[in-house]
């Protein structure tokens, strides 16, 4: 996680930011932190914080080592805890993901006497260059997909439905170590194979 946090800090330096607020699942996963919607990450020049309600404490404790926990009451906005950190860390320019900030949040940030700086493409570009772990993970995923495809082919026979084929793909993927399917399995036969994202049917 440290190398990726340093990439975030390098971006902060480029944009003259004192801190970066992370709400989106993709970037939280990139940093190896809890991805639940009730978790927000604040990276400052000197440290990092995981702002969350009590539901996530046990999960976070299992995987977090670099972020300081700030826990607020469930059902209460994270902005109260963020306001405390803005004061403690002397934050004046706060970066945030443009696609993740509500208008109401933006207005409240302005009320906290902080300058919100919305980032868009910069965060995506930061993740384009893959590290060794990511390259290995992509290669492993490709290997698993190849293996699953070969196993499913062994079981195909006339009369199988698309649902049955989809179930095999799902089963062998999970058996190989997948956590979940990233989207509905694409299985389409006959003229349905022309569909851009053919979801399985009883055909």
Over which residues does each language-model region extend?
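Flexible, acidic/His-enriched mid-domain "rim/lid" segments that flank
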Residues: 3, 46, 77-181, 192
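Fold-independent oxyanion-binding glycine-rich loops
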Residues: 23-25, 34, 53-54, 97-99, ...
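Divalent metal-coordination and catalytic microenvironments
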Residues: 41, 138, 187
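Short pre-catalytic strand/loop immediately N-terminal to key active-site residues, enriched for Gly-Thr
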Residues: 72, 135, 200
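Solvent-exposed alpha-helices and their adjacent loops that cap or buttress functional pockets
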Residues: 13-14, 33-34, 42-43, 88, ...
């Amino acid at each position: 996680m440290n190398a990726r946090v340093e990439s975030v800090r390098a971006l902060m330096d480029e944009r003259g930011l004192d801190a970066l607020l992370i709400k989106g699942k993709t970037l939280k996963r990139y940093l190896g932190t809890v991805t639940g919607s009730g978790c927000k990450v604040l990276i400052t020049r000197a440290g990092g914080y995981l702002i969350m309600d009590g539901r996530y404490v046990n999960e976070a404790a299992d995987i977090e080592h670099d972020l300081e926990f700030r826990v607020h009451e469930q059902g209460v906005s994270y902005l109260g805890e963020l306001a405390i950190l803005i004061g403690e860390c002397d934050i004046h320019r706060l970066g945030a993901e443009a696609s993740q900030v509500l208008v109401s949040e933006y207005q409240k940030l302005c009320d906290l006497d902080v300058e919100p700086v919305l980032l868009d493409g910069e965060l995506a570009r930061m993740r384009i260059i893959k590290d060794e772990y990511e390259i290995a993970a992509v290669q492993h995923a490709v290997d698993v997909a190849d293996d699953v495809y070969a196993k499913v082919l062994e079981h195909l026979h006339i009369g199988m439905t698309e649902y049955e084929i989809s179930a095999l793909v799902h089963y062998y993927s999970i058996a190989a170590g997948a956590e979940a399917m990233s989207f509905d399995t694409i299985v389409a036969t006959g003229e349905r194979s022309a569909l851009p994202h053919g979801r399985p049917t009883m055909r």
